A protein has these predicted regions:
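Amphipathic alpha-helical coiled-coil segments
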Residues: 158-171
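Acidic interhelical loop/turn segments
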Residues: 133-151
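Residue-level recognition of alpha-helical structural elements
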Residues: 40, 110, 114, 143-147
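Long amphipathic alpha-helical coiled-coil segments
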Residues: 173-182
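Basic helix-turn-helix/winged-helix DNA-binding cores
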Residues: 1-94
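Amphipathic alpha-helical dimerization/coiled-coil segments
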Residues: 83-131
């Protein structure tokens, strides 16, 4: 198989834990890696097909309530591929945040509109923090330590970012008043 996408490795990691359908993989992604690596159905199903063709997963038909579905399981080659990828150094971190991009160019807006960008970013981070707290509450005594490490990192990051937005709002408000043309 040629160069694999990070989404392919998300799928391998999810089916390493236990066999799953594409639908189950998507549901799991939505409550775990989505906060730092999202995957849509439009990515998951084509990747499952490529992984199966490469012999990294194997699908078996299963019926539930008259509905046909395919359950995917990782193969020995798939486990080797996943472990090889995990051992590689991570790609250089590249943050992409449209809110920060807009804030970077916010001098082009009246101050109140620029402040609204900061307020919306803060509200988004607080909402994400609440969602992560809800996920944390459902985990109980999770045996997997590294997903919990990442969850705690997400909680700390969203809390820090929301606090930063609050401080930036205060600084912008405290700055010299906006000059108005007469």
């Amino acid at each position: 198989m040629k160069q694999m996408s990070p989404t392919a490795y998300v799928i391998l990691g999810m089916v390493k834990k236990e066999p799953r359908t594409g639908y189950e993989i998507k549901a799991l992604v939505d409550n775990s890696t989505r906060f730092f690596w999202a995957a849509s159905y439009g990515q998951i199903y084509p990747e499952l097909k490529r992984l199966a063709e490469a012999g990294l997963v194997v699908g078996s038909d299963s019926s539930t309530g008259g509905r046909r579905r395919t359950v995917y399981e990782i193969t020995a080659d798939g486990e080797e591929e996943l472990q090889a990828w995990l051992r590689q150094p991570p790609q250089t971190f590249e943050m992409r945040d449209e809110g920060l991009l807009k804030l970077f160019f916010a001098d082009a807006l009246p101050r109140e509109e620029a402040l609204e960008i900061v307020r919306k970013m803060r509200a988004q981070r607080l909402a994400m923090h609440d969602r992560l707290r809800a996920i944390e509450a459902t985990k109980g005594d999770v045996e997997e330590s590294f997903p919990m490490v990442v969850l705690r990192g997400g909680l700390e990051f969203t809390e820090w970012f929301a606090d930063w937005c609050g401080r930036m709002e205060e600084e912008i408000l405290a700055a010299a008043p906006e000059k108005r043309s007469t």
